[in-house]
Amino acid sequence: MSINNETLRNSINDVEAGYEYMLAYAAQGLIDEPTSGGSGPSLRVYLERMQNGLLSIADDFETVIKDATGDNAELYLNYLSVLKEDAAKSKKAVDLVMSLPSIGSQVIDNLNASIHLRALLTDIFLIDEALTSLSRHQ
């Protein structure tokens, strides 16, 4: 993440860290969610952080876009509507998984494969890179 905005960076990190943790969790082949043990945060902690990031990421990007793009703001804001939809859809998927009494690896593997979550990550990378490119030429 190259944009220098701590709030946005935190939202992006929450989403990306959740995704990365889910990849490792899915690979474990767990039928049920561990109830104790282990070192570090649990899956649910990562998913809760991810939920928070998904709630705020579009608004956080909007703030940065309005500050950074000037006359091109409309183009970025138009694309931001796509990111907002993907974030909302991804959050609904995470909410569904969080509602389960126990979360197994297969459910997380399916969440990882969600086209909405993958689209959101691509949206984030595209807007970030576009803003970074723009800042180099201003």
State what each model feature region is:
Residues 1-80:
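N-terminal intrinsically disordered, cationic/polar leader segments
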Residues 5, 40, 73, 77-83, ...:
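Short, charged/polar micro-motifs that form catalytic or ligand-binding hotspots
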Residues 82-92:
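Short, well-ordered alpha-helical segments
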Residues 90-137:
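Amphipathic alpha-helical binding modules
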